[in-house]
From Swiss-Prot:
This is Formamidopyrimidine-DNA glycosylase. It comes from Erythrobacter litoralis (strain HTCC2594). Its EC number is 3.2.2.23, 4.2.99.18. SMART domains: Fapy_DNA_glyco, H2TH. Belongs to the FPG family. Involved in base excision repair of DNA damaged by oxidation or by mutagenic agents. Acts as a DNA glycosylase that recognizes and removes damaged bases. Has a preference for oxidized purines, such as 7,8-dihydro-8-oxoguanine (8-oxoG). Has AP (apurinic/apyrimidinic) lyase activity and introduces nicks in the DNA strand. Cleaves the DNA backbone by beta-delta elimination to generate a single-strand break at the site of the removed base with both 3'- and 5'-phosphates. GO terms for molecular function: 8-oxo-7,8-dihydroguanine DNA N-glycosylase activity; class I DNA-(apurinic or apyrimidinic site) endonuclease activity; damaged DNA binding; zinc ion binding. Binds 1 zinc ion per subunit. Its cofactor is Zn(2+). Keywords: DNA damage, DNA repair, DNA-binding, Glycosidase, Hydrolase, Lyase, Metal-binding, Multifunctional enzyme, Zinc, Zinc-finger. Monomer. GO terms for biological process: base-excision repair. The active site is at P2, E3, K58, R261.
Length: 271
């Protein structure tokens, strides 16, 4: 599933060609998406000018001059394609401008879009109870200490809770915990202040590096221009069970099931 860096990379790629442009045509092709396209989507977008693009957690945002925002989620396998040579049967949403064509391609159809008033964006149900952005100033030691106080739940699962930190997913939580040397099963309420400081730094470093690398291309994900992200070449633990820890401390990466997902860690250096 595309996570925060992949969505950020997607938004930046789209912005190069879509920001400031007038939408001349909108086509929706599939009625059987995870959620149906909102009524009136084509009418709302066609003729509108895109004033800016943004991201909140794992959601992409396309803001128009009609004070409306199209929210998109890439689901499990979604990606945007810019000026594709051919139409793909999985291109479920097409947006055209005078010079470019944008296709939202999603083979597994778990992605979706919504249309909301820009001024009411913070009240949209998916955002209303969401925690701070991991790359923003609101993610502080004080915030994490308050959010984790008394929590017996494993720190890995706490970090996946979007009400605690917005936008973190399995890949980058596993990687950040390794960098911070924190065991993923450790109770969130027992992580020390010093360790939380290291964790915040690790989260930001991992996410920022992945954005620079264009994200992690594992299965279906590619950048809008078709290029693959290469952060996967930097994985320290994710998907590396049975391989030696890169700290050369004699540890071997292990995997176990946690909260319905796989968790990877090094039992030697993560305590």
């Amino acid at each position: 599933m595309p996570e925060l860096p992949e969505v950020e990379t997607t938004v930046r790629g789209l912005a190069r060609f879509l920001q400031g442009e007038r939408i001349t045509r909108t086509v929706t092709n599939r009625p059987d998406m995870r959620f149906p396209f909102p009524d009136g989507l084509g009418q709302a977008l066609t003729g509108a000018t895109v004033v800016s693009l943004g991201r909140r957690a794992k959601y992409g945002l396309i803001h128009t001059d009609r004070d409306q925002t199209m929210i998109f989620h890439l689901g499990m396998s979604g990606r945007w394609r810019i000026d594709p040579d051919e139409t793909d049967k999985h291109d479920h949403l097409l947006i055209e401008t005078a010079d470019h064509r944008f296709a939202l391609c999603d083979p597994r159809r778990f992605g979706w879009v919504d249309l909301v008033g820009t001024q009411a964006l913070d009240q949209w149900p998916g955002f209303a109870a969401m925690g701070p952005e991991p790359l923003g100033d609101a993610l502080t030691i004080e915030h994490l200490r308050a959010a984790l106080s008394g929590r017996k739940q494993a720190i890995k699962l706490c970090l996946l809770d979007q009400a605690i930190v917005a936008g973190l997913g399995n890949i980058y939580v596993c990687e950040a915990l390794w960098h911070a040397r924190i065991h993923p099963r450790k109770a969130g309420g027992r992580v020390s202040k010093q360790a939380l400081s290291l964790l915040i730094t690790a989260i930001r470093d991992v996410l920022e590096q992945s954005i620079r690398d264009g994200g992690s291309s594992l299965r279906d994900y590619a950048q809008p221009d078709g290029e693959l992200g290469y952060f996967a070449t930097r994985f320290q633990v994710y998907g590396r069970d049975g391989q030696p820890c890169h700290r050369d401390d004699g540890g071997t990466i292990r995997r176990f099931a946690q909260g319905g997902r796989s968790t990877w860690y090094c039992p030697r250096c993560q305590r």
